[in-house]
Amino acid sequence: MNRLKKGDDVIVIAGKDKGRRGVVKSFAKGGSLVLVEGINIVKKHIKPNPNRGIEGGVVEKELPVDASNVAIFNPATEKADRVGYKFVDEKKVRYFKSNGELVDL
């Protein structure tokens, strides 16, 4: 179960961008892939197509990373953290497991 949401500040815990931080932009493949702003940037070679008005060249593009390779970033501890759920005032909220602070304020 993926406990991330769009707009969460995450840190990459595995892969070529390990240690870098970014914000979750979207999810793909039912939540198993996460598109993170500024992470997993690759260069794509685009073929020109004058009929569509596409100019050819090399374009940098963000690709999604597996959700298991990112963790939510806890600003209080400055480290990656895990997320749990609990009820506060009959409302389900997320909290950081290391210090118990709420993620959703």
Curated annotation (Swiss-Prot):
Pfam families: KOW, ribosomal_L24. GO terms for biological process: translation. Keywords: Ribonucleoprotein, Ribosomal protein, RNA-binding, rRNA-binding. It comes from the Bacteria. GO terms for molecular function: rRNA binding; structural constituent of ribosome. Belongs to the universal ribosomal protein uL24 family. This is Large ribosomal subunit protein uL24.
